[in-house]
Amino acid sequence: MANLKAIRDRIQSVKNTKKITEAMRLVAAARVRRAQEQVLATRPFADRLAQVLYGLQSRLRFEEANLPLLRKREVKSVGLLVISGDRGLCGGYNNNVIRRAENRAKEIKAEGLNYQFVLVGRKSTQYFQRRDQPIDATYSGLEQIPTAAEANQIADQLLSLFLSEEVDRIELIYTRFLSLVSSRPVVQTLLPLDPQGLEAADDEIFRLTTRGGKFEVEREKVASQVRPLAPDMIFEQDPVQILDSLLPLYLSNQLLRALQESAASELAARMTAMSNASENAGELINTLTLSYNKARQAAITQELLEVVGGAEALT
């Protein structure tokens, strides 16, 4: 009977755990939808900003503007902006981006260059602090759905590093969102800005949907809505001054998109991890229930044999 009670308690414990993992999966799904809505909400601003930059690019040659954020110089030190999460229970999301950042740092060191980290997320901060890596700034406790204010704060720190010439190049390492079951850590150069990278480009929107009772992600290519500025438009200020003012805003917008992609990747990884945990819990419950029924049947059979044996002894 003691064995039966232990199995019964274990079944109840696993059922309680399954309720928790299922709730976490649904919460992550709701937040993925919120992230999706935020991406759509920020598109008009991004399109208008791209329109102005595109128009300025058509009126002057960026190479002749000689702006600090476009100026390439000899690279002696590299800043690495790494975006990770604050929490675990999201599969290999944090480990993958941290490993990519660590490998990139080794590559930079092998080239004879210095590097320092700007870390977003508690997981990457804890990892690199324990290994005494050079860290310029850390950010944690950000909103589950990234905000423009957070992107601006990080962008200000990066601009300070670059313009003070503490670093000569800044690279961004984040997780690109591909699907609910797939994401990929990527590395891209943030500063100095590439004039060719300011051109209007098509975008991609993701939507969380349900099909057959399961969550799925639909991706849609969206043509850029950017149109050239009117040829007779007159700028009150010098176009170079306008461009100099808009480039930091463009950088913040790029950071916001990277934060959004990383957040969506983390939430999708958590959804997948919790879904797998729920399925494993269900299988474990079935196995334990089968074991419980077998043990109970064996106990009943043993009691019957004892009763029959006792009755035969009395006759």
From Swiss-Prot:
Instruction: List the InterPro entries hit by this protein, alphabetically.
Output: ATP_synth_F1_ATPase_gsu, ATP_synth_F1_gsu, ATP_synth_F1_gsu_CS
Per the record, membrane topology reads: Peripheral membrane protein
Where is this chain's protein located in or outside the cell?
Answer: Cellular thylakoid membrane
* Gene3D superfamilies reported in the protein's UniProt record: 3.40.1380.10, ATP synthase, gamma subunit, helix hairpin domain
The record's listing under HAMAP family reads: ATP_synth_gamma_bact
* Matching NCBIfam families: ATPsyn_F1gamma, PRK05621.1-2
Q: What is this protein called?
A: ATP synthase gamma chain
Can you name the source organism? Nostoc punctiforme (strain ATCC 29133 / PCC 73102)
